[in-house]
Amino acid sequence: MRVLASAPAKIILFGEHSVVYGKPAIAAAIDLRTYVWAEFNNKGAIKIEAKDIKVPGLTVSFSEDEIYFESDYGKAAEVLSYVRQAIELVREEADKNGNGVTVSITSQIPVGAGLGSSAAVAVATIGAVSRLLGLELSNEEIAKLGHKVELLVQGASSGIDPTVSAIGGFLHYEKGNFEHLPFMELPIVVGYTGSSGSTKELVAMVRRNYEEMPEVIEPILVSMGKIVEKAKDVLLSELDNEVRFVQLGRLMNINHGLLDALGVSTKKLSELVYAARTAGALGAKITGAGGGGCMYALAPEKQSEVATAITIAGGTPMITKISDEGLRIEEVLP
């Protein structure tokens, strides 16, 4: 028996950093997917085949007798620890620890770009292996197992990434509680800088500033929380999509300015953001912790132009859209 499952990447639409201080955030699944085949093996072991885990920005240098790989392959290896924990958790849940399982991974999601590649591979693995072992789990139950995987590997996790990946669509998050928001099409372009910042260090930097200047930083965080609630109102409204696009774009631009004020933007991120806006995006902002990673732009009828502008500015564009589907069982073969 073989099972194929897939799970999507995610972006934080609004609320990164302020969510650490109890403010709400909105995240969404996007139509870039990780695919996991699962099947039994007769060795009683866990075997992981990573076909094409993507590490963008690969640079290879050649000298007379050596080849230097200048990419962080530690990030790709880190993904495999999520896969192993996911398989072990599902085998425990199914009480089938002795079963050998082989998983084969292919992915459209770049590693280390802040798009939830680790959560997607964990969720897809849980989905495929649970079906293989005859364990019937809802997507909500799979999201909880995905959160448990993150806790085991990372030591801390809000649960946003695996929940969005398992359930799909838009999720409003506040103080540990999730609310699924109505779906609407958002034509977006994600731009990757080619580098990633340390979430831990960036969160610590904002914390230092908050502790030293609470009267300055607190109003910024409050404003970011209000942006999230306004964005939620827009998503819940029955206004025409064109009107909602314009309103969401304005909120994105304001949110980016506040993130810049917190010090988490970089020259490259700002270049991609402003290139996207100049090319016709209604809004563009950082998604995730900042310090590198990705931005995203809302670009109805302008995705190609915005993608070209991001490329010219030195980024890697990914034309995509919000995915209403989370985890999918794609195929089951006897």
Swiss-Prot record:
InterPro entries, alphabetically? GHMP_kinase_C_dom (IPR013750), GHMP_kinase_C_sf (IPR036554), GHMP_kinase_N_dom (IPR006204), GHMP_knse_ATP-bd_CS (IPR006203), Mev_gal_kin (IPR006205), Mevalonate_kinase_arc (IPR022937), Ribosomal_Su5_D2-typ_SF (IPR020568), Ribsml_uS5_D2-typ_fold_subgr (IPR014721)
Q: Does the keyword Transferase apply?
A: yes
One Pfam family, short name? GHMP_kinases_N
List the catalytic activities from the record: (R)-mevalonate + ATP = (R)-5-phosphomevalonate + ADP + H(+)
* Active site residues according to the UniProt entry: D161 (proton acceptor)
- Function noted in UniProt: Catalyzes the phosphorylation of (R)-mevalonate (MVA) to (R)-mevalonate 5-phosphate (MVAP). Functions in the mevalonate (MVA) pathway leading to isopentenyl diphosphate (IPP), a key precursor for the biosynthesis of isoprenoid compounds such as archaeal membrane lipids.
Question: What is the protein's given name?
Answer: Mevalonate kinase
**What gene codes for this chain?**
mvk
